[in-house]
Amino acid sequence: MTTTEKALPRLKQRYREEIREALQQEFNYANVMQIPGVVKVVVNMGVGDAARDAKLINGAINDLALITGQKPEVRRARKSIAQFKLREGMPIGARVTLRGDRMWEFLDRLISIALPRIRDFRGLSPKQFDGTGNYTFGLNEQSMFHEIDVDSIDRPRGMDITVVTTATNDAEGRALLRALGFPFKEN
């Protein structure tokens, strides 16, 4: 019987060895538990057109599963809205919550592979923090992820990505994400 060693994700290892110490020195924390870290990453794909054509949600589910390596949860409408021809319970989106090693591997692929592949990418906006150190940004198509075959895309779909951290304010969250390698625009 062979023993296999589980490799630590590259970004997680960098966080533990370098980034935590740098943040501790920058913010002068009294306790190591105060150092901000990443809790989870939520990837959401809203498919409003699925209200008219139910088959469109399957493409979003397949794309999200390929990108994240996890089966998405189908999000359904909470209430009916006549103007949008929407009934309660209709599928209108898909969502994946990533934690642990999958989260670190996704962030690594996002920062090092996907974001640099965006055409005319000038950096992420540093103003999209929510006040408690969490960061949300949107991508307008799924083709920048190398898991998606460009020829098999039935239609471009955007997605929202939320990075939830243990930071208590935006300055700590921004420092953590910048240290992890998020390319923020310089104002």
From Swiss-Prot:
InterPro entries: Ribosomal_uL5, Ribosomal_uL5_bac-type, Ribosomal_uL5_C, Ribosomal_uL5_dom_sf, Ribosomal_uL5_N. The gene is rplE. It comes from Mycolicibacterium smegmatis (strain ATCC 700084 / mc(2)155) (Mycobacterium smegmatis). Part of the 50S ribosomal subunit; part of the 5S rRNA/L5/L18/L25 subcomplex. Contacts the 5S rRNA and the P site tRNA. Forms a bridge to the 30S subunit in the 70S ribosome. Transmembrane segments: none annotated. GO terms for biological process: translation. The keyword Lyase does not apply. This is Large ribosomal subunit protein uL5. One of its GO terms (cellular component) is ribosome. GO terms for molecular function: rRNA binding; structural constituent of ribosome; tRNA binding. It comes from the Bacteria. Keywords: Ribonucleoprotein, Ribosomal protein, RNA-binding, rRNA-binding, tRNA-binding. This is one of the proteins that bind and probably mediate the attachment of the 5S RNA into the large ribosomal subunit, where it forms part of the central protuberance. In the 70S ribosome it contacts protein S13 of the 30S subunit (bridge B1b), connecting the 2 subunits; this bridge is implicated in subunit movement. Contacts the P site tRNA; the 5S rRNA and some of its associated proteins might help stabilize positioning of ribosome-bound tRNAs.
